[in-house]
Structures are given as structure tokens and as C-alpha cells.
A protein has these predicted regions:
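The feature marks the mature, well-folded catalytic cores of soluble enzymes
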Residues: 1-259
Length: 259
């Protein structure tokens, strides 16, 4: 399946909630307000449509509250999808649902070897032709190397060292082939050096805005959709020729996610 325009897979938050605790943001004692979450999801949906993205929808499933975080479903490469093998049992039920959706949409799905944990585009992001791969907290480095070998592309492994930034897409966001947003303390010293060596223009995010999930953004051309409360990043993006579009996503931060 090949799309002619930027296409984003989303899942309505019908069954979203904090049903378990698998990252430091999640607390069953601090539940998400489902009504507000739906309003925030609908605002993001409308914003992405306004930015000329094509939206594909996945049907929500009761008992799979994190299905809303569709970037974790797998890594798309042309007509193929490398399906996630989630580290936590609480999320492993998502994979058959994801697989069914992708196959019905015309993709070839590829399952991970059983011994490799891999969490999709949550931990694997392209900047240019290079695959940047976050590992240790959720995905295994061997899994990321296996995926890169299957795709025959260069991979740069990046060790994540802060449990609050457990996926690569919570602390790193490519903007173009030569630019990216990142939160330096989320990486070990080698990872920081590797990013600096391979990406000419890096935009660091300050602590307060990293905690607002500034890096967990959606980039469509020169437009960047992100959570509210990131004024420094928004200013820097404008200076670099991008147009930031903020929309509140606080209810999803309660589960460790954003846009």
C-alpha cells in the first residue's frame, strides 16, 4: 500500500484509560478524564486534517487502552510493516489487532523473532536514509539491528537512559533529512555524540518542555503539531522556517504519550 499524501493512522480513545502502570507517567490513582481525552483527540484529528494529512482510523478495542498510541503498532517500510513485539504483556494483545488492520489495508506484515522485543515507530525513526533506533527500556538492540538488516539500511543504535523517556519518539523527532528535535539527557553519552555526528542541525529541548512531550510531535512538511506548553521550542521552530501548531494533549501524557 502506497499513499500519495502524508497519511496517519489514528485510533479513537473509546477505551483509553490508565488500566496498568508500565512507565513512570502512569498511575491508576490518577485516571484520565475520558470526556476531555476525547475532546483532545478530536482536536488533534481536526488539526492534522487541516494540515492536509490523510487520516486512517483503527477500530478501538475494549481492554486495549494504549491502542490509541498507533505509532507503536509497527514500523512501516514501503509496502511492509514490521510488527511490534511488546515487552509488557499488558500491550501484547494489540499486535493481532494491528496486524489485521495492516493486512486489510494491503500491507505485508512481518512478525518479529520471538526472542526480540521491538516497539515499532516508538523506537525506530528515520532521519534521511538512516534509521535511528532507541533501545534498552522497551526495544532490544538486536531486534533493531535485525529490522535494519531486513530493510538493508544503516542503523544508529541509541541507548535510552531515562525511564521517563522510554521510547525514542518521546525524546527525538526528525524534522527533515538534516534536522531533528531531541532531549539530550534521555540518551547516554555515546547516543548524544552519535546524534551530533549524523544530524547536522539538532534542536535541543529544555527539561520543562521535554516533560510536556515536546519531542512527541507530528511533522507534516513544514508544519509541526505538538502539545501546548512548549514556547521555547515553538519559537525555535519558527526561526528555522517551521510552523508549530499546538493543541492540548495533557490527558494522554498521563499514559506517557502525546501526539
Amino acid at each position: 500500500m502506497k499513499y500519495d499524501s502524508p497519511t496517519i493512522l489514528m485510533c479513537p480513545p473509546d477505551y483509553y484509560g490508565i488500566e496498568y502502570e508500565i512507565n513512570p507517567w502512569m498511575s491508576r490513582s490518577q485516571q484520565s478524564n475520558l470526556e476531555v481525552a476525547r475532546q483532545q483527540w478530536e482536536s488533534l484529528y481536526a488539526l492534522l486534517q487541516k494540515l492536509d494529512a490523510r487520516i486512517e482510523l483503527m477500530t478501538p478495542v475494549k481492554g486495549l487502552p494504549d491502542l490509541v498510541f498507533t505509532a507503536n503498532a509497527g514500523l512501516i517500510w514501503h509496502n511492509r510493516v514490521f510488527l511490534s513485539l511488546f515487552r509488557h504483556q499488558a500491550r501484547q494483545g494489540e499486535t493481532p489487532v494491528d496486524q489485521q488492520w495492516f493486512e486489510q489495508a494491503g500491507f505485508e506484515t512481518i512478525e518479529m523473532p520471538e526472542e526480540f522485543f521491538f516497539e515499532g515507530a516508538g523506537d525506530a525513526l528515520f532521519c534521511g536514509d538512516t534509521l535511528f533506533a532507541g533501545y534498552l527500556i522497551r526495544s532490544d538492540v538486536k531486534a533493531l539491528q535485525w529490522v535494519a538488516a531486513e530493510m538493508k539500511c544503516r542503523v544508529i543504535p541509541l541507548q535510552l537512559v531515562d525511564e521517563f523517556y522510554y521510547h525514542l519518539d518521546t525524546c527525538f523527532c526528525p524534522l527533515s533529512e538534516t534536522e531533528a528535535i531531541y532531549y539530550p539527557p534521555a540518551f547516554d553519552s555515546y547516543g548524544q555524540q552519535a546524534l551530533q555526528e549524523h544530524i547536522p542541525h539538532l534542536i535541543p529541548v529544555v527539561d520543562e518542555e521535554a516533560q510536556r512531550f515536546a519531542c512527541n510531535a507530528v511533522v507534516i512538511g513544514k508544519s509541526v503539531a505538538l502539545n501546548t506548553g512548549c514556547p521555547q521550542l515553538e519559537q525555535t521552530l519558527r526561526e528555522r522556517g517551521y510552523e508549530p501548531h499546538s493543541t492540548p494533549l495533557d490527558e494522554f501524557i498521563k499514559a506517557g504519550g502525546s501526539a
